[in-house]
């Protein structure tokens, strides 16, 4: 195997990270010469990055092929018509890059490929005898990210492995989904990632069920609620919990209005002279679900989860109502709102409030609130419905056992969906079943962010000196360097490099005319798993220095044995 000579390689390392780099992976990928920024959320992948990303892709291909996946390569440029067939042309909004050709035709750059693969299936699949099918590709995707940041974690151009399963029925989809789940677990394990699979929100993808694969890291932008006792885990967009029952008093026979001039926040109502604890307040929020008003009610000390509201309403998109939209509907401005006997719009109430009494809420009159509110009597009895709306908090009870939930930041590295017939029905992708009846194909969709795997590995595996790569995705398995300029050291190092190559070990040969300290520092920064140093003293005794990047002590290894030792280490870790 051919070694790469450092003196001839393009490895533009930096002593300092860019000022705007906030997370470890961004800092280290730039400092180690893996990436450079071309524009906001747009990166150049330099040779070291390409080597690591190619290894990630190879692992993905092996595991996809192992479950019967067949690789495609479909266009990144899509005509608008195909997205309009599924109804998602308008749903994607500003996240989609859109353009017109010279004839005025509408196109987009693909964020994902459900529509495109469904079109292939519609045109080519005719019978249940052709199913199941598992198709995938590793291809560039585009997203007009409003706030690109964190290096490769939030970008506008990225590489995704997207796979799609096609089955004749739900049972087949269940099998395909589990095949993908197991394949994902193997992929992430081989890439050296500690991960957790969690229940997730399907969002604009649709479908009946989805799971995300998450890496626990402070660099993550998602929140996961997990129970260490029973291993329940869910994105807080879908997570539920047990809330301790409140000891409410009997309340009043009917709500009573009282003046609250200038009180427009939960916190203000907690203060004297009113002194109403947040847990006894009803927080009433006005949202627009597909531009239709909906009222959401949660406890005063709880937060509304917009993803849960979207699920509860079945809306394509939800947003907070603009301040000027609220008074015509509610009769008051934000801060004095309530849902007591309110029937002018759909009202959703979090289940934790169902049996609460003696609560306080806005009176839908500026400067006034209501006390003595019985949620079941005064809200639910007038057409409001219960729906999971609140964001769970750390310390709340697990919904599956007697344990307590932990909530932590996490980074999504993969997402799998049971799409069902969402796309096949809208795009008329059908096959004949065993009884000769036309039925819509039952689909699944499965995505992995290739660059996110690289970034996540670095977030998990780094120290003060640089990256600590897992062997399977390191740009090189080993680096060989000399501890002096003497010709005999160079000759011995060349022989070690050749022996390593014969064993299939990928080597970066640091042949630069630099001090040993500089070479050691760069080796640590690049994160190469094995460091082999050839020095005068050791060579005189027939040895070389061996050190593992992952916290290993320096060992002396006979020159004739080092290649075998390295090969064994590579095989054991990949």
Curated annotation (Swiss-Prot):
Transmembrane segments: none annotated. It comes from the Bacteria. GO terms for molecular function: aminoacyl-tRNA deacylase activity; ATP binding; proline-tRNA ligase activity. Catalyzes the attachment of proline to tRNA(Pro) in a two-step reaction: proline is first activated by ATP to form Pro-AMP and then transferred to the acceptor end of tRNA(Pro). As ProRS can inadvertently accommodate and process non-cognate amino acids such as alanine and cysteine, to avoid such errors it has two additional distinct editing activities against alanine. One activity is designated as 'pretransfer' editing and involves the tRNA(Pro)-independent hydrolysis of activated Ala-AMP. Homodimer. Belongs to the class-II aminoacyl-tRNA synthetase family. ProS type 1 subfamily. This is Proline--tRNA ligase. It comes from Anaeromyxobacter sp. (strain K). The gene is proS.
């Amino acid at each position: 195997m051919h070694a790469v000579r450092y003196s001839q390689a393009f490895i533009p390392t930096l002593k300092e990270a860019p000022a705007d780099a906030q997370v470890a992976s961004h800092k280290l990928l730039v400092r180690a010469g893996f990436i450079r920024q071309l524009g906001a959320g747009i990166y150049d992948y330099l040779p070291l990055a390409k080597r690591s990303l190619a290894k990630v892709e190879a692992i993905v291909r092996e595991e996809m092929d192992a479950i019967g996946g067949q690789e495609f390569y479909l266009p990144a440029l899509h005509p608008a018509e195909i997205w309009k067939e599924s109804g998602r042309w308008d749903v994607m909004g500003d996240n989609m890059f859109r353009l017109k050709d010279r004839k005025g035709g509408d196109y987009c750059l693909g964020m994902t490929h459900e529509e495109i693969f469904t079109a292939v299936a519609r045109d080519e699949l005719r019978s249940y005898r052709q199913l199941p099918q598992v198709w995938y590709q590793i291809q560039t995707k585009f997203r007009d990210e409003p706030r690109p940041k964190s290096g490769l974690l939030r970008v506008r151009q990225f590489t995704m492995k997207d796979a799609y399963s096609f089955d004749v029925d739900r049972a087949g989809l269940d099998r395909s989904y589990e095949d993908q789940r197991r394949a994902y677990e193997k992929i992430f394990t081989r890439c050296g990632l500690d991960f957790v699979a969690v229940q997730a929100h399907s969002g604009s993808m649709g479908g009946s069920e989805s799971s995300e694969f998450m890496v626990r890291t402070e660099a993550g932008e998602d929140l996961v609620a997990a129970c260490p006792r029973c291993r329940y885990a869910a994105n807080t967009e879908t997570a539920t919990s047990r809330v301790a029952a409140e000891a409410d008093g009997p309340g009043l026979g009917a709500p009573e209005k009282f003046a609250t001039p200038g009180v427009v926040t939960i916190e203000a109502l907690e203060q004297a002279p009113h002194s109403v604890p947040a847990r006894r307040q009803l927080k009433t929020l006005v949202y627009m679900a597909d531009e239709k008003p909906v009222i959401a009610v949660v406890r005063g000390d709880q937060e509304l989860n917009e993803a849960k509201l979207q699920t509860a309403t079945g809306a394509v998109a939800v947003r907070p109502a603009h301040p000027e939209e609220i008074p015509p509907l509610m009769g008051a401005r934000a801060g004095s709102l309530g849902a007591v006997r309110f029937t002018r719009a759909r009202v959703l109430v979090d289940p934790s409030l169902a049996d609460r009494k003696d609560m306080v809420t806005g009176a839908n009159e500026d400067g006034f609130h209501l006390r003595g509110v019985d949620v079941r009597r005064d809200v639910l009895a007038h057409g409001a419905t219960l729906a999971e709306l609140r964001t769970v908090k750390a310390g709340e009870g697990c919904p599956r056992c007697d344990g307590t939930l932990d909530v932590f930041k996490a980074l999504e590295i993969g997402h799998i969906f049971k799409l069902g017939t969402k796309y096949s029905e809208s795009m008329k992708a059908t096959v004949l079943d065993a009884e000769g009846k036309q039925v819509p194909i039952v689909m699944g969709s499965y995505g992995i962010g290739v660059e996110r795997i690289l970034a996540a590995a670095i977030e998990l595996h780094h120290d003060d000196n640089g990256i600590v790569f897992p062997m399977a995705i390191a740009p090189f398995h080993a680096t060989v360097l000399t501890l002096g300029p003497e010709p005999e050291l160079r000759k011995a190092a060349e022989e070690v490099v050749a022996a390593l190559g014969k064993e299939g070990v990928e080597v970066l040969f640091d042949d630069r005319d630099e001090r040993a300290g500089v070479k050691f520092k760069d080796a640590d920064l690049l994160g190469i798993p094995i460091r082999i140093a050839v020095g005068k003293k050791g060579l005189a005794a027939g040895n070389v220095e061996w050190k593992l990047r992952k916290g290993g002590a320096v060992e002396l290894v006979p020159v004739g044995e080092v290649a075998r030792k390295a090969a064994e280490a590579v095989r054991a870790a990949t």
